[in-house]
Structures are given as structure tokens and as C-alpha cells.
């Protein structure tokens, strides 16, 4: 069962193809969006490359495409200035030309880093996303956001650079650890929470089917998530308005990640899980959202085994002032004012500008920060 979701961006439109067996079809599908030279650099990490690198390379070579494989170290640490410089140097050493392409095979780190390298290499070359985590399939591979992290925060240096094609092969999820699968589910339920109550209700009763990797459930869950993101990106590519809704849970989540040092102790999807639960509780505390919706949202996130409170992340209390400072670094902030995606209810998120710092601090203290 293959589903294709178009991302409507005029001359830069592309398809997100979702379903099993897509790695084996990658040759013909990538060849269709490649230039005449038929050469690609596949960027992957050591873990993903060991599982899927040879299979993807064989499919590409079978379509007459020359393949150079670049392997980076796994983990968020690669998504840095040093990692970008190293990847750029390796691409230059290959003498990749503008008519060639980069193929990003991996999760969000690989996609973000390879996509940013594609955006700036020789002032920009095309690239293809082949996301291998559930989180990347429903979020970072779609929409053209590419970036690296800095010590001051996550994704603060980057570019908008749309892929030519996204191949979301559901078969690759078979090797994905349960923790990574739950992280992807956080981004899936985000779409229901921000704008589709019926989808949220479906997820409440089908969470286990998704986590058990049931193909029909995955096609529906990934398909609807991508469909919603594609619709929003087509309307607001560069986050001037509605696209900011996709950051539900991310302002709180990124602040927590920054305090935790962006390491393995707290994965991005887990941070988003806490952040979404906090966004709903904060909305309820401000009187914007019914308290029962905040309770229901938290229960649905928790059902996937995701953390929903600061205490779930670590026993030591967080500093409220430090979290607020990180929130001020958020890309949605304007004029030094705090901006959050909050909710009037499940399926009804909105962008709240100039959020009161005192109210935020009182909420964080209530949440267990000091």
C-alpha cells in the first residue's frame, strides 16, 4: 500500500511517498528527479548505513546512478558547525557538481545536516530525503527546514531548502528501537492536537497498532501527518504565520533539551511530548483551554510511553529562569517577547504572542521548577 502526498510549492513542488518497499524502488524514483549526470552522494550515519546503506546504494546503481557513500557519526553531536564543516569538505573532495544530488539516508540529524549542506554547497544543490525514523518521516524530512545546533540552542543556524523528493519506507521502521518509535509518535499526535480532533480520537484508540508497526495503521498515521504538514507548508513555507503551529510543544521542549545538553538522556520526541503536555497545562492555567482537554492530551501522550512532566525527565529540579531564558531564544520570539503555541482545546492550537513572563514563571514553579 503506497500513498503519495504532494507538497504544493509551484515550481518547487515535490512528492512525499509513503509505504513499504520504497528503498528497493529508490533507483527509478530518484532517477526521475535527477539531472543528466546521474550522480549522488548518499549521506548516512554509521548505524543506519549498516542496516540500509548497501540496499539503497544497490537500488540507485541499478538505475544507472553513480553513488558515493559518506558516513557520519551517529547522534546529535554531528549536527554542529564542526559536523557541517567536515561534511562540506568531504563533498568538495568528491567534486560533487551542481547537477548532482545529495541523498540523506537517516533520521532527523542526518536529514537536517545533509539538507543544510545541500543548501549551501556551491550555493545550493538538490537533495532527496530518505527518512529512516518515524519522527523524521512525519516531521523533519518534509517542509524544507534544515539546520545545525549551537551551544545557545537547537536549530538556530540553518536554511529553508526544499527536497526534490521524500521516500518514507515503512519497512525501515522494523529496525527502529521502541524508544525511537515513541519519539515519532509524539510528532504524529501533535498533528491531532494542533488541528484535527478526529485524527486525535483515532490515535487514542490506535496508539498500540502504530507502535506495533501495523502497516495499515502506519500508512494512515504517517499519511495524515504528512498531509497536514504539506498543507501548512504550501500555505506558509517560511513560517510567517500558520506554519508556527507546527511548533506546538517545541518552545517548552527545546528549552528542556537545551538544559539537558541535547544528549541521549532526552531525545527530541520525548522533549516534544513533555512540551505539548506543558503547552496544554499552561493553556488551561491561563483559562484558554478546558482543564479536561489538558488532562486528555497528557493521557494520550503518556499512552505512548512518553514523558509528560519535568519530573519524568530527571529527578533534579530545573531552573525556571534558565528555562525562560531558553524560551527567549526560540525562533518564534519577536522583539524580545515570548511566543508560544498554545491551545483553546484539542485540535485548536494558536500562536500566542507576548506571553507574560511572570505567569510563565509561576506555571513552571507549579510544574516543579525552582
Curated annotation (Swiss-Prot):
Cofactor note: Binds 1 divalent metal cation per subunit. Can use either Co(2+) or Zn(2+).
Example GO BP: chorismate biosynthetic process
Binding site for Zn(2+): 187, 250, 268
Catalysed transformations (reactions): 7-phospho-2-dehydro-3-deoxy-D-arabino-heptonate = 3-dehydroquinate + phosphate
Superkingdom assignment: Bacteria
GO molecular function: 3-dehydroquinate synthase activity; metal ion binding; nucleotide binding
Cofactor or coenzyme needed: Co(2+); Zn(2+); NAD(+)
Compartmental location: Cytoplasm
Family annotation (InterPro entries): Dehydroquinate_synthase (IPR050071), DHQ_synth_AroB (IPR016037), DHQ_synth_fam (IPR030963), DHQS/DOIS_N (IPR030960), DHQS_C (IPR056179)
Binding site residues for NAD(+): 108-112, 132-133, 145, 154
GO-annotated cellular components: cytoplasm
EC number(s) reported in the record: 4.2.3.4
Pathway: Metabolic intermediate biosynthesis; chorismate biosynthesis; chorismate from D-erythrose 4-phosphate and phosphoenolpyruvate: step 2/7
Keywords on record: Amino-acid biosynthesis, Aromatic amino acid biosynthesis, Cobalt, Cytoplasm, Lyase, Metal-binding, NAD, Nucleotide-binding, Zinc
Primary localisation category: cytoplasm
Residues annotated as signal peptide: none
Family recorded in the similarity comment: Belongs to the sugar phosphate cyclases superfamily. Dehydroquinate synthase family.
HAMAP family: DHQ_synthase (MF_00110)
Function: Catalyzes the conversion of 3-deoxy-D-arabino-heptulosonate 7-phosphate (DAHP) to dehydroquinate (DHQ).
Protein name: 3-dehydroquinate synthase
Source species of the chain: Caulobacter vibrioides (strain NA1000 / CB15N) (Caulobacter crescentus)
Gene it is expressed from: aroB
